[in-house]
Amino acid sequence: METAEPVSYEFPGHAVGAVAPRRMMGSNVGHNFPFYTNPTGGYTLPFHQSSSPAYSFGHTLNHHHHHHHHHPGYQHYFVAGQQPINPQPVRLSSEPPSIQQIPDIRPAKNAVNRVARDPLMKIEHNGASQQPPGAQSSSNEEGAQGKSSSSNEVEFSTEVDILMKAIQAKASAQSPGVQSLPPLQQLTHGGSNGYPQSYSMPVTTPRCTVMVEEAPSRSGKKRKYACTLPQCGKSFAQKTHLDIHMRAHTGDKPFVCKEPSCGQRFSQLGNLKTHQRRHTGEKPFSCDICQKRFAQRGNVRAHKITHQHAKPFTCLLDDCGKQFTQLGNLKSHQNKFHATTLRNLTMKFSQVTEGDHMSPQDRKLWEYFATLYKNSNKGIKGRGKDRRISPTSRSDPGSESRRRIEPLSSTDDKMRRASYGDTSMYNGGSSSDDDDAEPYFIERQAH
């Protein structure tokens, strides 16, 4: 076995000599214990934080001699001839219990609020700032991989979405009785309450338990089939609806479009049938006033608003007062013409704490956005770029005045129809095909 050569570590305040590990000549030496040839346990000892500063091996390393077996500087890292112990680390009763990650379960978007992960994200960023440079680089690489893997998904990050995240975060913090659940991936078996010490457990509500007492479904049936996954507890009147809901957790999409060069997958058969109408051009639903036909029943309901000359969505920012027939058009208008006002409101609302006085105008805007975009975490889509499923046909010159806008099928259908028991994003109806309220045609001004 080769001898070790001293190298110097330059620590602030003092320089200590350390022994650099060298490559071992014998092939029978375990990789986990490079300094020992005697038999040791086949496990890695857990790291226990000592009272001395990190990387401090003691002054004895300055006298680099060749007797490594009983070197006091490595007693916290390698123990020779130790008897086999319990793989679980021994801890004092005063120490907090160890945190163990539960299996990675994909959360159902209809049962979990994404805004609730912001506090945990801040804690993770603070902890990452104290990591060594090597750990930071590795975490950055993992973040880049995660970002690239989710680059195909539609992200809603407009000014309205950012404002709604701030409002929903404050609303959940100030109203613990109706607080949304934290994401399933970040739940840990920490203390007695199942949460890590840095995250306080929300107040238990009837919706947070597995066996819940919820109101009957719209059909009047009792919701007796409940989701058994941790911290979900949604219940349904039919077992089929529960099976569909479970696919939102697992990500299973058993229904595949058989159209050549398509192959998109869906979690519900109804979503597949709706998607197939885009290939076939079938439009089974018609307006009883003008006989205009649509592929989805919900689009007929949105279209009828144009016959009623009703514009129920009004912009209250900057005393605008402009009215719109569809919520998506109002959102696009606010993002385009009131971006500065939205940013100012986001800054103001994010700094609001419980007990602070809020002016009547700010309170009105708070309630206005909280009610108008209450389902924005599911994706209220406005008129934006790159939102079409296929290029617009240019054979008809008159088609520029009226353009057909269709959503991306796989991602938007997943957000729009998380489960049968969920509500629609626009009108509170069912998320099935008959009650889809997706805007189908959008008027465009000729330039």
UniProtKB/Swiss-Prot annotation:
Phenotype of the disrupted gene, per the record: Completely blocks ochratoxin A (OTA) production, and repressed the OTA cluster genes at the transcriptional level. Alters the MAPK pathway and cellular iron homeostasis. Significantly upregulates antioxidant genes and downregulates oxidative phosphorylation genes.
Keywords for the protein's UniProt record, in alphabetical order: Metal-binding, Nucleus, Repeat, Transcription, Transcription regulation, Zinc, Zinc-finger
Any matching Pfam family: zf-C2H2
Region annotation (Disordered) ranges: 125-155, 174-199, 377-447
First and last residue of the signal peptide: none
PANTHER family the UniProt entry points to: KRUEPPEL-LIKE TRANSCRIPTION FACTOR
GO CC, one annotated term: nucleus
ZnF C2H2-type span: 225-249, 255-279, 285-307, 313-338
Subcellular location(s) of the protein: Nucleus
InterPro entries: Znf_C2H2_sf (IPR036236), Znf_C2H2_type (IPR013087)
Keyword GTP-binding: no
First-listed, main subcellular location of the protein, grouped into a coarse class: nucleus
Nucleus recorded as keyword: yes
Classification via PROSITE patterns: ZINC_FINGER_C2H2_1 (PS00028), ZINC_FINGER_C2H2_2 (PS50157)
Chain ranges passing through the membrane: none
UniProt-listed SMART domains: ZnF_C2H2
Compositional bias (Basic and acidic residues): 397-416
Record's protein name: Transcription factor azf1
Summary of the function given for this chain in its UniProt record: Transcription factor that acts as a positive regulator of ochratoxin A (OTA) biosynthesis via controlling the expression of antioxidant genes and oxidative phosphorylation genes.
Molecular function GO labels: zinc ion binding
Annotated Low complexity bias: 127-139
